[in-house]
Amino acid sequence: DAIRILFILNAGGMPLVDPSDQTVGKIFKGEARLHAFDFWMRNPDYLASELLDVYEATGNADYRQAAEAIFESDEPDLRRIPMIRYLFGAYERLDDALSLLRSRDLVRITGIKGKVKVHETDFILTVRGVEVCSNAVVQEPILEWYAQRAALVAEIAGTRGGGALKDKQYEQATYAQTQLGGIIPP
């Protein structure tokens, strides 16, 4: 889980420059956004559906070809990692994965906190975290799938926030009709 999350944060993060801290590399805004990215990474059939929607909207054949490649390589059967439907959509506790990344100073967790609750959780990818992503695909080429898939998910997501991405995912009937606490079916 940790390496998948690291690649998501790298692909979906925006460059971050902090003159007082040269160790920061990127910022990924929003935990709901992270869960939405993770859902598409773990559910290739839903990602393929979104790719086809984008193809229909833009006419860009690259998106259709990417969707076809997902099915031709049997990804929905081979790469699917189920997620449960929670209050605001697909959810998985990421504490263990994030703890591992945090303990190696690859990711730092911050955000906007109110008096009563956290308004937004943001993830700072350190320069070291960015380097791990770059080096990992060289040292272990099999990890290139995670880098490429996270980049594709980031491209499809664009600048949309977690709420907008979750709304888009809820447009899928099987997703929306999943019982609260149930596993979202393929």
Segments from the language model and where they lie:
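Minor-groove-contacting beta-hairpin "wing" of winged helix-turn-helix DNA-binding domains
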Residues: G114-L125
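Structured domain cores in non-transmembrane regions
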Residues: L51, A66-D96, D105
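A short, conserved structural fragment
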Residues: L98-K113
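Short, amphipathic alpha-helical interaction segments positioned at domain boundaries
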Residues: F123-A176
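Short, amphipathic alpha-helical interface elements at domain boundaries
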Residues: D1-P76
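Alpha-helical scaffold segments in carbohydrate-active enzymes
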Residues: A36-N43, L100-S103, R128
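Intrinsic disorder/low-complexity detector
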Residues: I8-A11, S134-Q139, T174-P186
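Intrinsically disordered or highly flexible coil/loop and linker segments, enriched in small
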Residues: Y46-L47, V107, G162
